[in-house]
């Protein structure tokens, strides 16, 4: 029989064990909550909560503060990576609930035309007022003249290199956004080596909103109109030659092909294939000719506009020319054959030339590109947005979708046709557009 004393000790011991268990459970829950609060997924939402706390600020337009600014370094690289970097700068400013001070872009790639590597104001390429009108309440741009006190600037250094991971970059931005002593400064100036080229914290839809607000200036739009008019005129001339043989009643359609077969691209894509252990990045001229020629629904004649590197325009031998080898009914033109290489493109820097070519390809009846090209991917993103506004969520079947796009480096329903291509708007990052993908499909999500 147990003594009363031993029963009492047992009860005390049981209570002690229960208390210890409760304490351990409490500690575990505390650390779990702490870890979750610092996870990458919640880091951005916490920063957005910080931004929302300032929504009632009297000095704001549609929730974006107009008396607090973010300044960023000159944006570099090619047109399309500059567009992405600019969008990231806008979204960073949005996360910190600040107005972005209008940044400078770069007139050319830094490894090409070194003598022309000079800053070019954003509003020399894209419409400033139109940007703010279209993006009202989402992101906002200001001119440096709007800053009251240029001496009140806080320099916020953004890291780079392999150790500066995506998670570390986001945590750094989040902590800076929550730091009230930093937020007191009228201007936060981000410094670092090309701080917006690499790290990505936002979904495709957020980037798409910014891109939609980036409307090129009238001068670039007019130059693109001239090129498109030349293409249409070439189509009409071909129709006149065919007379009764043509099956087209309306305007002769044109297909824009972003043809990446220049030497530096082929070297790059071969290395990329080796690194990624895939074989669907590079395409030979023959593969492009065959797959474009097998696109369903192309009428006779159809004009092809070949958006190619200038080095490919100088080929002397007919067999190696980008203009040779196309099937009957497809009439190829490039800048030189159209007569616009010097007359239009030659007047401008590399950046503006790219912007004109982008607009021309965007306006095509059909676009065909490479899914590992940023240029091609951004055009398909914008064409996807236009198609969705017309009610086309996919392009899996032939129909009334006037914004069809294809990836010639990927096989479609069979090896002989290119894959139908729409941007997946549900992706949580811009990875597939920034770095390319072989997982593209005919659905926008």
UniProtKB/Swiss-Prot annotation:
One of its GO terms (cellular component) is Golgi membrane. Its main location: Golgi. The keyword Transmembrane helix applies. One of its GO terms (biological process) is fucose metabolic process. It is an enzyme of class 2 (transferase). Expressed in dry pollen grains and germinating pollen grains. Keywords: Carbohydrate metabolism, Fucose metabolism, Glycoprotein, Glycosyltransferase, Golgi apparatus, Membrane, Signal-anchor, Transferase, Transmembrane, Transmembrane helix. Pfam families: O-FucT. Glycans are attached at residues 97, 179, 294, 424. Probable protein O-fucosyltransferase required for correct pollen tube penetration through the stigma-style interface. May be involved in protein O-glycosylation events during pollen-pistil interactions. This is O-fucosyltransferase 23. It comes from Arabidopsis thaliana (Mouse-ear cress). The lineage of its organism: Eukaryota, Viridiplantae, Streptophyta, Embryophyta, Tracheophyta. The gene is OFUT23.
